[in-house]
Amino acid sequence: MNIKSLLLGSAAALVAASGAQAADAIVAPEPEAVEYVRVCDAYGAGYFYIPGTETCLRISGYVRYDVKGGDDVYTGSDRKGWDKGARFALMFNTNSETELGTLGTYTQLRFNYTSNNSRHDGQYGDFSDDRDVADGSVSTGTDLQFAYITLGGFKVGIDESEFHTFTGYLGDIINDDVISAGSYRTGKIAYTFTGGNGFSAVIALEQGGEDVDNDYTIDGYMPHVVGGLKYAGGWGSIAGVVAYDSVIEEWATKVRGDVNITDRFSVWLQGAYSSAATPNQNYGQWGGDWAVWGGAKFIATEKATFNLQAAHDDWGKTAVTANVAYQLVPGFTITPEVSYTKFGGE
């Protein structure tokens, strides 16, 4: 009701103003020139200039749908049916040139829907209460997954930890973190130096993140700290990072190497060590002191890519996953994947 009153009041004021000037000569304003949207190709495909500015904008996104069956590779429990999930991600990139370098922003919104198998608790369907039961669930959520600003080599905002991003993520598979290599999303202030000879270095002050069961954000003013070095060439790359968890006052490190055997076949290997032999920390979230991951990618055709990853940690957990990412048509990829987990002590 308040909004409607404001709109009516504004309309009345405009009519009164027009009536007061009725005796004046009416001069029609010159029509403004039409400004068409211009393509901006300086930062890649899909960018256009925001009208009236020299800032380039790209709007993109994806839709993903997962169907999972068999045992839960993270816990070992039997799903007793299908678990399904859907995600819509909406992404915005902006870039413009300044006297201090390229000023950029990146934002990603995620809309998630998850439906787990109900496993019949006796309240739905013709089953008795003595069945091996576990209630299913349906959940929805919206996350601001990324929101950061870049200027030159600086990055400020919500991103994923440099403990992951600087060395590179794990394999191109869905269940890549059965043996976790650290928490992901965090607030951070980071600077990356990039040399002209393939050498780069990073230093980051991070807030820490949280998962379903644990909160790894900092306690007080002292941030978590990450530093790393990398060398990359046509043959591949080698990178290492060291991270300090300011809450438990322990550190963790990772070293990773990638080798391009051919233009279609590549392999990678990563080893990690933590001074605290517990996964309840921000960085060294594998079991025990150490963990190792490795994988391979083979581009079989223009449409089909094979991916393989294996991992093992100090507590005896082993995880192996393989998939085939098949591009049915441009923009639509189907990825069948199979995973195996052997838990420590089995």
UniProtKB/Swiss-Prot annotation:
Main location (coarse class): membrane
Family indicated by similarity: Belongs to the alphaproteobacteria porin family.
Subcellular location: Cell outer membrane
Membrane topology label: Multi-pass membrane protein
Subunit organization: Monomer.
Keyword annotations: Cell outer membrane, Ion transport, Membrane, Porin, Signal, Transmembrane, Transmembrane beta strand, Transport
Entry-linked SUPFAM superfamilies: Porins
Domain notes: Consists of 16-stranded beta-barrel sheets, with large surface-exposed loops, that form a transmembrane pore at the center of each barrel. The pore is partially ocluded by a peptide loop that folds into the pore lumen.
Protein name as annotated: Porin Omp2a
Keyword check for rRNA-binding: no
Any single Gene Ontology cellular-component annotation: cell outer membrane
GO molecular function annotations of the record: porin activity
Signal peptide: 1-22
Note, other: The pore formed by Omp2a is larger than the one formed by Omp2b. Omp2b pores have optimal permeability to allow growth and protection against harmful compounds. The larger pore formed by Omp2a may be advantageous for intracellular growth, when the bacterium is competing with the host cell for nutrients whose concentration is particularly low within the phagosome.
GO biological process, alphabetically ordered: monoatomic ion transport
Purpose: Forms passive diffusion pores that allow small molecular weight hydrophilic materials across the outer membrane.
